[in-house]
């Protein structure tokens, strides 16, 4: 009958509306879940970026602190060596005056140094360079000489051990005072060593004073070798 047909049509419309409503609810739920997942992903990305930025800042702060510590140690050593250099000049002048030399400074040996890491090769020269660790430009006050870790490091000249031990960013270090050489007070330092073989007293030219390593602020096995004249660094090439 017409009434039954009308009722059936209403039922179909109701079921269709219900199904569409359920589908709309499911779609809304899926959209909420997708939005929640997207927000979680964005939150995670933001947290990761914040953590990475903090890590970079911490690394930069650490590098600046290491640089400051190494500069302070360099300044301290320079002051010590300048004081020793002045004492050596006074002693040489007094000795020359006593010998009737009119106060001149004597020549101390031939002045040429042995290669401090036999068989090693230079990987970084004295002077301006970009630091291989932090990529920042600066001044390199010595020669970097490379060889496999564990190779012997020798005294470039005979001298007196000024200091031996850990020296912050310089790693395990030995500093030698060679007195007057070629008319000027000379000292040398040997840095980043794996281990040290002398702790005080006198050493002879060519004597093993330690073994090459990569201690301190270093990016690989090498010897950082410095030559000091009158307490300040000079290019070791002029002495080797």
Where are the model-predicted features located?
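Alpha-helical oligomerization segments with coiled-coil/rod-like character
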Residues: 1-106
């Amino acid at each position: 009958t017409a009434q039954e047909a009308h009722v059936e049509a209403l039922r179909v419309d109701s079921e269709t509306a219900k199904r569409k409503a359920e589908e709309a609810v499911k779609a809304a739920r899926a959209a909420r879940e997708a939005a929640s997942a997207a927000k979680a992903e964005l939150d995670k990305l933001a947290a990761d970026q914040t953590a990475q930025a903090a890590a970079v800042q911490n690394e930069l702060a650490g590098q600046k602190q290491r640089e400051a510590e190494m500069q302070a140690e360099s300044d301290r050593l320079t002051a010590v060596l300048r004081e020793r250099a002045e004492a050596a000049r006074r002693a040489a002048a007094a000795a020359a005056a006593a010998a009737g030399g009119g106060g001149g400074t004597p020549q101390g040996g031939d002045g040429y140094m042995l290669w401090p890491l036999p068989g090693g090769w230079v990987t970084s020269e004295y002077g301006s360079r970009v630091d291989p660790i932090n990529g920042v430009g600066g001044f390199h006050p010595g020669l970097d000489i490379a060889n496999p870790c564990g190779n012997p490091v020798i005294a470039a000249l005979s001298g007196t051990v000024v200091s031996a031990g850990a020296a912050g960013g310089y790693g395990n270090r030995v500093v030698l005072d060679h007195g007057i050489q070629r008319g000027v007070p000379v000292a040398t330092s040997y840095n980043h060593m794996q281990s040290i073989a002398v702790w005080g007293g006198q050493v002879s030219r060519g004597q093993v004073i330690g073994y090459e390593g990569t201690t301190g602020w270093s990016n690989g096995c090498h010897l950082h070798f410095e030559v000091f004249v009158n307490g300040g660094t000079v290019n070791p090439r002029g002495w080797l």
